[in-house]
Amino acid sequence: HESKFQENLLDLVKSADIETIWIGNNSSCKHVCDRVKTIDYVDKDSKDYIGYGVLDEVVIEGLKKVLNKKKSNKTLIVLHTMGSHGPAYFNRYPDEFEKFKPSCKSNEPQSCSLDELNNSFDNTIVYTDYIISKAIDVLKKEKESQNFLIYASDHGESLGENGVYLHAAPMRIAPKEQIHVPML
């Protein structure tokens, strides 16, 4: 991966004397976070390891922990969540967030109806909205510093449009569903 050998945004922020921390609940950071402080719940070699498939609420606890121990009011904290990653959308949210039914309960999205698949994906969005609101609540309690939150996904997701599922198609042929990434 090029990120192992090239500076990235986290390196630049850190070089500006801004405390930089990566809190991960997704697969590896692919070397993007190698040179900053990291709390990684899914890396088996990490002292913070919990296990793969843990719900994203764990990053909120990590955020609280970091805010309690931060050394500077100038801090960048990245929350790397599982979010809406497929194929097991139904594993990305607790049962109480299953608002759209029927939902797909399979690791093989093409085995479900498009309605079931879309419902499962939409349930991940409901849970992600909850996680974002919890992060905002935590930041609002920080009275001694000004805070803001930016949310962006790392990619979009194909949900059966034209028979295409998931993500990671090469850019030159990727459908718009995979490359259109909203930001809040």
Task: Go through the PLM ranges and name each one.
Residues 1-184:
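Catalytic domains that recognize anionic headgroups
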